[in-house]
Amino acid sequence: PPPLAGIRVVDLTHHLGGPLATMYLAQLGADVVKVEPPEGDGWRHVDSVRGESRVFHAVNRGKRGIVLDLATPEGREALGRLVDRADVMVHSFTPGVAERLGAGPEEALARNPRLVHCSLSAFGPEARRGTD
């Protein structure tokens, strides 16, 4: 079996770094569930051919998908149920967003103490853009 067979990953990433990281987990056999907002991941609309984005499909191959409206209590509770059963959760929200959605490390680990919580913020935990 693949090295990560049996590992469940909740993917709350966007842009490229996070989706690439979770794509590699899927390629190694993890069961990755990509969570998208009702309007779809932003990459679905980039570089599209006949309405299908090559970029989106390239970095999300091997994943299952679910649409959740995390702006609603129902969407956040559905996310919580995914977290309950997950081994890993990866997000690429700007600082503070995961906490507002109930997906920050304290909330997620309270639901699932064995969870590996991974944050891939583009500009670090304090959201300062690089200046070098």
Give the predicted meaning of each segment.
Residues 1-132:
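N-terminal helix-loop segment corresponding to the beta1-alpha1 unit
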